[in-house]
Amino acid sequence: MDHIKLIRNKIDINHIHQLIIDQSCGACSVFVGTTRDHFEGKKVISLEYEAYESMALKEMGKICSELRIRWPTLKHIAIYHRLGSVPVAEESVVIAVSAPHRPAALESVSFAVDKLKSSVPIWKKEIYENDQIGEWKANMECPWPQFTETSSNAFEYSLCKIERQVENISESKLVQIRVSDIELTRRIKCFLKRKRDEINLHNIIDFKQQLRDSPRAESMLPKDSCARTQSILVKQQQSISHIKVHRAFEDRRQTRPDYSSQLNKLMATKHKHCELVKSNVLKNARLQNIEEYMRITPDDEDNIYNRIKNIENRILILESTSPEYKYYIKLGKESNNINKKESKKGLYQSDRLSEFISGIKRQYEL
């Protein structure tokens, strides 16, 4: 089992020893790192540790995984590191390993100490007796290069291995231009300008209005045109491209395809399809109104016959539960005739309307 932890209190070595001890293991190796009281002639009071905690725990877990790959017989692994202020002679890091045999335990602990110093993002600051601010110490064992004011501006060619193998490359695939940067930039700009002019020329040919009905029509066209406002494009049915339609004037009498009849055929099929869709929409709308009135929730997968059948079943249920729905509520012929008479509208001429208005005035005068 792996035990990894970052703590801010004093590390309990006995507790860690109890975590890694096992009956099947004959060796327990423990490394304890403490704070010494001097460094380069300066008296050290304490050390302060800071860490990128989430990344540090992740890297410590990777160390445990690598230890188990290298030494599969390891039983328990414990890596504890202290953060914050660590006084002199107190423990800052503890690495403990248990294994069946001594060599695996000793070698794995030594490897874990080196790996912890080089890969885990934990930073150390030394507090001296005469300097309470302290000094951050660079980790000389980390794999990445140490940048200084001089090295940050320079490029380390020794870190990049350049393999020079140019002799076997065929000359047909290479183009060598021996000019200055200014000349090379000028050539690139000229190339781009030429390609832009070609595109503009094709746009003028494709989209510019071609009026040939009169000899003066060509002179009336503007010199510059806009493809967005002056172009005429007809979209081809069932295609993602466009057809540019032009009127052709030929001296020779040749048979040309009848484009109008072909377009009419295509448009006829489209109109028929639209009519069918409209008829289906009307039928569905009428059925939907009846279903809403009868409080029936239709299913999207049902066809029209199933929906009519559901309406009939609903009517039968209403007739069975309420007999008056069928027998007692009936409108006679007289009531129908009365409604028809009331709904009938009369037609009056202007002289008849004037007589009617004058009669109303007489009634109010009396």
From Swiss-Prot:
Signal peptide range: none
UniProt pathway: Cofactor biosynthesis; molybdopterin biosynthesis
Any GO BP: chromatin remodeling
Primary residence: cytoplasm
EC number of this enzyme: 2.8.1.12
Catalytic activity field: 2 [molybdopterin-synthase sulfur-carrier protein]-C-terminal-Gly-aminoethanethioate + cyclic pyranopterin phosphate + H2O = molybdopterin + 2 [molybdopterin-synthase sulfur-carrier protein]-C-terminal Gly-Gly + 2 H(+)
Subcellular localization: Cytoplasm
Keyword Transferase found: yes
Family in the record: Belongs to the MoaE family. MOCS2B subfamily.
Extra facts: This protein is produced by a bicistronic gene which also produces the small subunit (Mocs2A).
Record text on subunit structure and interactions: Heterotetramer; composed of 2 small (Mocs2A) and 2 large (Mocs2B) subunits.
PANTHER family: MOLYBDOPTERIN SYNTHASE RELATED
Annotated protein name in UniProt: Molybdopterin synthase catalytic subunit
Organism name: Drosophila mojavensis (Fruit fly)
Lineage: Eukaryota, Metazoa, Ecdysozoa, Arthropoda, Hexapoda
